[in-house]
Amino acid sequence: MAGTRHGSGPALRRRIPTGLLGGSFNPAHGGHRAISLNAIDALKLDELWWLVSPGNPLKPRAGMAPLPARLASAQRMARRSPIRATGIEAELGTRYTVDTLKKLVRRYPNRQFIWIMGADNLVQLPQWRDWREIARLMPIAVIARPGYNDRAHARRAMGWLRRFVRPADLKSQWTDWRPPALVFLRFSPDVRSATAIRQADPRWFERYEGRALRDPLTRLRLSGPIRKGRI
């Protein structure tokens, strides 16, 4: 599934095509895995990293499980795949996506990144800090989601991004694009949701109590008590 990097000369070393998908993963579920595997195939990625956020400034803290539990659920869901679930944002000390991406680009110069988001996040993108700078850092792939696609195209973000949209049939060539560059991906809809899982099992995170985790990127151990009380 490795993508081909077209360089201008033999001295240009191929960088590893890597997707970045951020989120709370509260918890991670089969829908996350399905869209990620589809994106890996469509974009010819070597790997896709799940950036499990310590905390989303745009989401309420109520109902948010502790990071160790969310990361454990993500690592479990990513097994036997090119997906790597990481809590590297906690180690980087970043709160906003733009700061995380800047640090990842500097830390991993041998990787060529593409930011992956759902169409629902594209609707919210103008609320993100320095959102235009995110688009200037790396290409963006937007995954269509039922109920969001028409609104996503009409929102303020697309007023600026529309000029940078690339044809979907050229998606596998994203490593040749100079950002800003945006491509829309359409896969079979997946109705699974973290909200439904939490409603069916509000204490889902307790099954990860006491598990010690090693982050696949930082190699640091991440562990901590899983709160027994209200989340």
Language model segments and positions:
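Nucleotidyltransferase catalytic core that binds NTPs
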Residues: M1-I231
